[in-house]
């Protein structure tokens, strides 16, 4: 039985450096790429393209770091998670590295393409209804080590290596824009970046149609938000008390991006910068481009992933600006 990391966990600089050492050679140290504006480089906005990771998203960082620290006896049993997207694919990829079995519990409304994406990593797939999934999360079987992506604070260490790399590679950074869904990515980046440069501002970004953290921070309490049909569907997550406290402690604020701005950012990244980003990945650039330079200064945008449906991408590229 694996005991979850306590919700009081706040990684130190040493924790982030240890995580960086563990993931070296597995996760790519992604470069900081100047944003290209119509074939001219904009040195004031740098892109951190996590979509070039082996599984197409940043999640390999936190997942590998978590699995690597499991007791070998427990790890050999196998690993499991609840996810229809990047988390399950990252866990399947990492399980193959360690040579252990893996399982993905996927909601029955997930598109077949996402189910197949996890199956390609050799995962055992269990399709469940939402009530069944909630029961599984509350009482996971002991046959596999269960990674609860909604509550495992140990993910902060691995995800935070992004913030470490940003400040090591661009120490003059003034502002980092990062998507905020569950909260572990944005808070991990903030904790690591501020450990090296306390004055750096880290701004989380929500979609206007799914403003969970934005509204909850405004009201100073959890504000339930109905799931929305947003291009940034990968960060269409509910806000919990623990995660609201974490985000409030670590981020300098959360801003909103409209669907039009997200769409424009996806198109701009693909056409001008040759980078394919999902909506949740492009949302950081959408926010940065909507913020005057005087307010943001030297900027880094974390592009968290590239898992976008090809047909959706095609529609965006064909649509008018």
Each language-model region and where it sits:
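PLP-dependent amino-acid enzyme catalytic core
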Residues: 1-321
